[in-house]
């Protein structure tokens, strides 16, 4: 769709090579079948906007995964969704294939902030999307929220967080805005057109958010994560416990046998390598 001004992850706004990319993903799953641990408790479908994929695309990926892991026995299957992509047809399909948790990229409940970030959705779409998801039977919903934005935006965190709490998501991930080289915000900062928020102010914002969430029965269980009791993310916990995980796709990371590996962060090169049966990492690091 379009790039958020803060995004430093690998992404593509073009869908021209989507079909080839799906085939390459499936091929990587097949090539790395022997690497998958015997017991897996979670599956996370992320990478930005997987909700853009159609039913046929996702079904193809799940069919390949079912040949490798026991999907029906997974405790947690999460898919990232943007608010503007949520509709009843898509939600019913997610349930059909076994998805039991949604991670929704809300980021803010203030339309002016969303526009400044170059997000496509607005507050109304957040409210409609999350309410529809819950009415459809998705009660395990995680919301991504960004704080630490420049002072000129004059955000009302009390209002924003209160509106999110009113939706009763089971989980929140609160991330500080980071301004990275190579992003639009990074370009503005380099040219002295954007001043990052002072650390002391950011710390106060996070402390306030943390206390507010704790007062509403959310447990602060990791650096950026809050959840209702028994709703902590299995997938997140695996990272913190340094359990093995496998990342599939361009730019994906894996951690196996005390080794970290990075897939190449270029769609065309990833497709080329996967389709000629090569699954070597761009980078390998021994821990």
For each predicted feature, which ranges?
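Cationic, low-complexity basic patches in intrinsically disordered or flexible, solvent-exposed regions
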Residues: 286
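C-terminal scaffold of the Radical SAM
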Residues: 11-33, 39-275, 279, 283
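Local cysteine-cluster metal-coordination motifs and their immediate loop/turn environment
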Residues: 1-9
């Amino acid at each position: 769709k379009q790039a958020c001004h803060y995004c430093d992850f690998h992404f593509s706004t073009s869908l021209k090579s989507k079909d080839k990319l799906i085939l390459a993903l499936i091929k990587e799953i097949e090539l790395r079948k022997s690497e998958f641990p015997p017991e897996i408790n979670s599956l996370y479908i992320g990478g930005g906007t997987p909700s853009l994929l159609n039913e046929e695309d996702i079904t193809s990926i799940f069919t390949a995964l079912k040949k490798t892991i026991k999907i029906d026995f997974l405790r947690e299957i999460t898919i990232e969704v943007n608010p503007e992509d949520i509709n009843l047809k898509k939600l019913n399909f997610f349930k059909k294939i076994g998805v039991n948790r949604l991670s929704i990229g809300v980021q803010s409940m203030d339309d002016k902030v969303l526009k400044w970030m170059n997000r496509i959705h607005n507050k109304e779409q957040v409210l409609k999307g999350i309410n529809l998801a819950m009415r459809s039977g998705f009660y395990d919903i995680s919301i991504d929220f960004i704080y630490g934005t420049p002072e000129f935006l004059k955000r009302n965190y009390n209002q924003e967080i209160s509106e999110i709490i009113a939706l009763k998501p089971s989980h929140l991930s609160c991330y500080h805005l980071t301004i990275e080289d190579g992003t639009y915000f990074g370009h503005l900062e380099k040219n002295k057109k954007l001043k990052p928020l002072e650390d002391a102010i950011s710390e106060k914002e996070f402390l306030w958010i943390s206390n507010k969430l704790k007062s509403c029965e959310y447990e602060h269980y990791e650096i950026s994560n809050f959840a209702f009791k028994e709703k902590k993310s299995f997938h997140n916990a695996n990272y913190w416990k340094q359990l093995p995980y496998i990342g599939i796709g361009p730019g994906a990371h894996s951690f196996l046998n005390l080794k970290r590996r990075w897939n190449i962060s270029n769609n065309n090169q990833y497709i080329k390598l996967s389709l000629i049966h090569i699954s070597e990492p761009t980078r390998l690091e021994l821990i």
